[in-house]
Amino acid sequence: MAARLATVACALFLLSSALLRLGCRARFAAEPDSDEDGEETVAFPESPPQKPTVFVVVLARNAAHTLPYFLGCLERLDYPKSRMAIWAATDHNVDNTTEILREWLKSVQRLYHYVEWRPMNEPESYPDEIGPKHWPNSRFSHVMKLRQAALRTAREKWSDYILFIDVDNFLTNPQTLNLMIVENKTIVAPMLESRGLYSNFWCGITPQGFYKRTPDYLQIREWKRMGCFPVPMVHSTFLIDLRKEASDKLAFYPPHQDYTWTFDDIIVFAFSSRQAGIQMYLCNKEHYGYLPIPLKPHQTLQEDVENLIHVQIEAMIDHPPMEPSQFVSVVPKYPDKMGFDEIFMINLKRRKDRRDRMLRTLYEQEIEVKIVEAVDGKALNTSQLKAWNIEMLPGYRDPYSSRPLTRGEIGCFLSHFSVWKEVIDRELEKTLVIEDDVRFEHQFKRKLMKLMEDIDKAQLDWELIYIGRKRMQVKEPEKAVPNVVNLVEADYSYWTLGYAISLEGAQKLVGADPFGKMLPVDEFLPIMYNKHPVAEYKEYYESRDLKAFSAEPLLIYPTHYTGQPGYLSDTETSTIWDNETVATDWDRTHSWKSRKQGHIRSTAKNTEALPPPTSLDTVPSRDEL
């Protein structure tokens, strides 16, 4: 009996335990947990991981002109500054690079996780260099040692990534760092743009370690192929993932024991990467930023300043302007008129974007202009045209689409005509006229001032000088002007992008009384210097002795051509001159006139107008295509 009771008791215990367990499960499944006071306990979701840490290396020498904009781009990277460290070094300066970098570091050190500052005030130059842009072996060695010290510090700090970026590289895309990290490569670089084909990568390398031209380079550089590509060399700006095991084998200095190539920091590092079994990658999926073309060893810091200016103004064609860091002082600019009595910039009031870009572009070049509010062809009506006695030149037809004159072209003509009138009224001896859709050649200001100085010295009798046009005489060379390099006698041309005009030239153009026999202004000018190919048009203008010349090579070009993104024409997208109900929109298919300059035969290229090459021109610049 006792044994049976014990068995029953044991069974009841086991059953109650099972029921308790089932009850607990049911309760947890059906009811939220609560504390002793009856309050519910909620399970919070896990937070995302923090961004990887990035160790940024800044090596600066004679960079007072680039630093404000470089640092501004660095500040605007969309990445938590608390997850970034700055390792900055500067040496061998003849400008105030040290002061600018110190000013910035003091202002931002509280924002970044870690800041290390390594200035060296003396000496100002390397004993074996010929100028501040020269790279003797002593400079290569010093830079490689600095990069190695930075790499060692990044490893000691357990940084996830290290970003090397030259101080004349401008990451204008704020997402660049995030985009490179996402690629998950040991070494990866964003493709940077320059005014030429130069960039921060090689697609080919010879067995001796020299640059090798390949078809792939152009395909990648011009975005004909887009993606992230394996390449033998990236330089100037690149990201290294220090979490990857193979990265432990990377070194900048000393060179690998098997290294026999040229003593150059970027080639030494590419060899190190190869020996470590690490593939370098170059990405061109987006536009990331800009870099200048390297100068030759004999070139000066002033030329480097001009390099920066050109990078800035080229970037503004399709993107917002580069702004300097808010934490450093910027040297003020002092615009002038380059020796002209006046510089006019013609702009439609409704094209504020063009006006703003041009004003900033001209300011960066220290050029002072007066804005001329253009006559808007869209606002012209028949009554106004009659009041001004405007009639189209009989028989005129556009050379490509065979359409008559448009009101947009009339507005353009009247805009230029108003400038000529002001030149006469104010008795301006030497005037420059530019339109609002131009891009400037490298060293524009220096080259134009030198050209005008040479013209004055030669006492050339001139009345019009094109600085931007579309040359239509492509089979034979235009005649070079004796004693003035970079100047030719102008032949038939399209476009009025920019030109210098004298008082006598303005008087001849206004005196031709063109309102009653009007055609586009860029067709009118060749008639006035007797180079228009259509004889019938010339018959309506008796005096055709305008003394017209052109810069060779040209100094300005259109920002966009027909068919390119951003191309816009206010002259062709308009209405017929005498019938505002007939629209003219030939831009997309018929506007050959607005297309890029066609091929000029080698026999037509004017070498007589160019200065002879010097021995310095043959000195190769570092890493130049």
UniProtKB/Swiss-Prot annotation:
Family of the protein in this entry: Belongs to the glycosyltransferase 25 family.
Sequence motif: Prevents secretion from ER, positions: 622-625
EC number: 2.4.1.50
Glycan-bearing residues: 96, 184, 381, 579
InterPro entries: Collagen_mod_GT25, Glyco_trans_25, Nucleotide-diphossugar_trans
Region (Disordered): 597-625
Pfam families for this protein: Glyco_tranf_2_4, Glyco_transf_25
One MF term in the entry's GO annotations: procollagen galactosyltransferase activity
Reactions accelerated catalytically: (5R)-5-hydroxy-L-lysyl-[collagen] + UDP-alpha-D-galactose = (5R)-5-O-(beta-D-galactosyl)-5-hydroxy-L-lysyl-[collagen] + UDP + H(+)
Protein name: Procollagen galactosyltransferase 2
UniProt subcellular location: Endoplasmic reticulum lumen
CDD domains, alphabetized: Glyco_tranf_GTA_type, Glyco_transf_25
GO cellular component, one term: endoplasmic reticulum lumen
